């Protein structure tokens, strides 16, 4: 039985968002070739939910002419930094991070990731001891984009110090004939899984799945 819901804690729930309550602007603009910080938080706690969307998808209803660019799922890089670290713990294309590795949008959901109504979500618990920063880099050579994002987090001064930090590793390859190493990691931690996307060099030809694949 999960009795945590009945336990008194010092947690406070807060939200980081691109919505500006003064201007009523919902998004931040990320021109091609630029990096923008979505937000930065100081304190001890954990992220419990990340939700993000782009023009022409979730909010196409109030902005019908908004262009739709699925390539932005590969060219927009998401980075998350923990505790003032110089290197990001998360660095991956937004599509791959949320489980859409081939830029083909489709609704799905599992325990930790999913896409619904044009928005992407991640519910992995992500602890931090001193704070976090989230930024995005637009590496697209043609497309500027807007981002609408909400990050739900809990500040908890009593957070267990013996917890791991959430990390990702992104790898990609083409024309592979040898075994492909998805990641090589050393240190204490848990491997929680991967999102694997494959596509044949001949589009819409699934014959490459006829060969034995080993993981």
Summary of predicted features, one role per range:
Residues 1-215:
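Beta-strand-centric surfaces of beta-sandwich/beta-rich domains
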């Amino acid at each position: 039985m999960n009795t945590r819901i009945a336990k008194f804690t010092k947690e406070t729930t807060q939200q980081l968002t691109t919505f500006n309550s003064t201007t009523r602007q919902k998004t931040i603009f990320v021109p091609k070739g630029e990096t923008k910080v979505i937000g930065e938080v100081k304190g001890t706690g954990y992220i419990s939910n990340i939700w993000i969307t782009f023009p022409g998808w979730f909010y196409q209803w109030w902005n019908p002419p908004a262009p739709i660019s699925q390539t932005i799922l590969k060219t927009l890089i998401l980075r998350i930094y923990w505790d003032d670290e110089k290197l990001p713990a998360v660095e991956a294309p937004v599509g791959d991070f949320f489980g859409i590795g081939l830029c083909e949008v489709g609704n799905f959901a599992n325990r930790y990731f999913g896409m619904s109504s044009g928005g992407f979500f991640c519910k992995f618990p992500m602890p931090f001891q001193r704070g976090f920063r989230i930024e995005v880099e637009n590496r697209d050579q043609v497309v500027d984009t807007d981002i609408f994002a909400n990050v739900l987090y809990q500040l908890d001064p009593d957070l267990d110090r013996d917890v791991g930090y959430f990390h990702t590793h992104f790898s990609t390859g083409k024309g592979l004939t040898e075994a492909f190493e998805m990641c090589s990691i050393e240190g204490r931690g848990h491997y929680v899984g991967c999102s694997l996307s494959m596509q044949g060099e001949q589009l819409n030809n699934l014959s490459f799945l006829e060969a034995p694949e080993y993981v």
